[in-house]
Amino acid sequence: MAHRLQLRLLTWDVKDTLLRLRHPVGVEYATKARAHGLEVEATALGQAFKQAYKAQSQSFPNYGLGHGLTSHQWWLDLVQQTFHQAGVRDAQAVAPIAEQLYKDFSSPSTWQVLEGAEATLRGCRKRGLKLAVVSNFDRRLEDILEGVGLREHFDFVLTSEAAGWPKPDPRIFHEALHLAQVEPAVGAHIGDSYQRDYKGARAVGMHSFLVAGPEPLDPAVKDSVPQEHFLPSLSHLLPALDYLEGSSARL
């Protein structure tokens, strides 16, 4: 008879898995700009942010830690680039807006806990599982999780800034497994990114589940993820864990 799998650790992505922004980035940026006397279209800022974020992440990955930057400075530079691409050339006028945005994005009021997150985390705890965060976030994450009432569910929070490696780098997953003192085969990761979360965890021998994010899934991605690994919502996780652990006994 096959040995029944008993998971011991669940690691979690955060943004668009457990939390999401209450308002789109462009709206947040435009609102703060208006409070400082600067009128910029939210749509233009949203588009500029996507372009600036991609460029900044490619030039200075993982908050520029390898280039001598702090995550704080990385974000201030990104805000400056966003406004510049949206047509605002006055860096001095943008500076206080950037500082305010950095502070506001640290606040729990900017974030919303996704439906089913708290109940699912409680359910996982009742199963005796260790829970941890593995997120490509910066040092503000601990305070954000504390502020929205989710920090108490986790044994530890591991950010890419603290670890030194962003997902899908296998080293951040190995570090989480080391901190939890469990083997990959009894760990599972939950997140909304196919590359960073689903594939990243599987590359180190963990199980993983893909959460439906705000954007439609690429059909090719959906075809490559078994139905039992796909979570239309967080409330589907506990039944998926039952199926995973039960299926090992049926092998």
Swiss-Prot record:
Residues bearing the modification N6-succinyllysine: 15
PTM sites of type N6-acetyllysine: 15, 130
Domain of life: Eukaryota
Pfam families: Hydrolase
GO cellular component, as recorded: nucleus
InterPro entries hit by this protein: HAD-like_hydrolase_domain, HAD-like_sf, HAD-SF_hydro_IA, HAD-SF_hydro_IA_REG-2-like, HAD-SF_hydro_IA_REG-2-like_cap, HAD_sf
Keywords of the record: Acetylation
Entries under CDD domains matching the protein: HAD_dREG-2_like (cd16415)
KW Transferase (keyword) present: no
Gene3D superfamilies cross-referenced by the UniProt entry: HAD superfamily/HAD-like (3.40.50.1000), Haloacid dehalogenase-like hydrolase (1.10.150.720)
Family of this protein: Belongs to the HAD-like hydrolase superfamily.
Record NCBIfam families: DREG-2, HAD-SF-IA-v1, HAD-SF-IA-v3
Protein name: Haloacid dehalogenase-like hydrolase domain-containing protein 3
Species of origin: Bos taurus
Encoding gene per record: HDHD3
